[in-house]
Design a protein with these regions (language model features):
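Structural preference for solvent-exposed beta-strand-turn elements
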Residues: 1-354
Length: 354
């Protein structure tokens, strides 16, 4: 449907409502405006976004004619766009008899950031192309995996509209749009059915005055059909070696060692020190860093990207690395003391050495 390349603008009273959809995901928001004449129009969203992005942060005049032609003007600039008849624009679906729960906006976005990198990009494994939400009473877990690594973020909800359990898979495209939400409002309301999820970011009065948003920003998305695999079976329960490492330093060392590495780097863990090496037919690199570890020496190899991704996505200075041997998965863990932060873990499959 060509009209799905457009955004629907509806001017009414002192507001303009903006809606866009691809039939699987819909987004709706409202901004304040001085409306001289009510009406609706659809415009190509890509071109409109480019124009708005380049305009100065000042008032913009928008005029329509014939229901499809629009003139956008501001100080010294005028743009004319041709849209399509708004009557052809499909309405966003509503959720009926849905359950819901509330979560802090910043916490949810941090949890998503902590796991979304592990989503699968394999079209054949469609159930893994998204983030799995699992709510048990007041505990919420977000999970992503591509079969070679697993990321889990868990948080105890402090505000809950419903104490029931639920689980659904949010598609990767919805996750990407959710991560782009503006940093406004304090809470997000998630309403869900067996087939759809509505994510509503409430806008405060202060935000209305400062940025022009009003009401709420809503995302309505279909969920991925199918049952998510039992991720708890993947988490090792018998790792008996544990080292405390400085996150930023380890990220720097892994990044430098990977410059020479092929598809793997090797961690040699010994008393108070970790040696990180990478090699290829072109040469080799070696990094040494202090760690908090006392025990038998161990060596394990990983894909460097699978280490870099979780290290980049957390704020905590120190993390725990759990391991057993060169044939077993490694586990990166963060258990923050602050209640506002989520517990995080990332399971990474090793690369076998010859």
């Amino acid at each position: 449907m060509p009209i799905l390349q457009n955004v629907l603008l509806q001017a009414s009273k002192d507001s303009v409502f903006l809606t866009t959809t691809n039939l699987d995901l819909g987004i709706n928001c409202c901004v304040k405006a001085e409306v001289e004449k009510e009406g609706t129009v659809t415009l190509p969203v890509r071109e409109l976004s480019k124009i708005v992005r380049e305009l100065a942060d000042i008032e913009v005049d928008v005029e329509t004619s014939d229901g499809t032609k629009v003139s956008i003007s501001t100080r010294g600039s005028t743009f004319n766009l041709v849209g399509m008849d708004s009557k052809e624009y499909p309405p966003l679906p509503g959720l009926e008899e849905s359950d819901s729960f509330t979560i802090n906006r910043e916490c949810l976005l941090e949890m998503l950031k902590s796991v979304s990198y592990a989503q699968s990009v394999n079209e054949e494994r469609y159930m893994l192309k998204g983030v799995f939400f699992k709510k048990e009473s007041t505990d919420l877990s977000l999970v992503a995996t591509d079969g070679r690594r697993l990321a889990v973020a868990t948080k105890e909800l402090t505000i809950s509209e419903n104490d029931g359990n639920c689980e659904f898979i949010l598609p990767s495209i919805t996750v990407n749009e959710l991560e782009k939400l503006p940093q406004i409002g304090n809470t997000i309301l998630l309403s869900y059915t067996d087939r759809q999820v509505q994510i509503e970011l409430n806008v405060s009065e202060q935000t209305y005055e400062n940025q022009g948003f009003r009401g709420s920003i809503k995302l309505i998305s279909k969920v991925v059909e199918g049952k998510y695999p039992n991720f708890k079976q993947v988490i090792p329960k018998d790792n008996f070696k544990s080292a405390m490492v400085e996150r930023e330093l380890m990220l720097e060392c892994v990044s430098r060692a990977s410059l020479i590495a092929d598809e793997r780097i090797t961690l040699r863990i010994k008393n108070k020190e970790m040696e990180i090496t990478g090699q290829s037919i072109l040469g080799d690199a070696c990094e040494n860093m202090p760690i908090d570890y006392e025990g038998e020496e161990a060596t394990v190899s990983f894909n460097p990207k699978f280490i870099q991704d979780p290290l980049r996505c957390v704020k905590k200075d120190n993390i725990t690395l759990e391991f057993r041997d060169d044939m077993s998965p490694g586990v990166f863990k963060i258990n923050p003391k602050e209640k506002e932060q989520a517990n995080l873990l990332c399971v990474v499959m090793p690369i076998r050495t010859d």
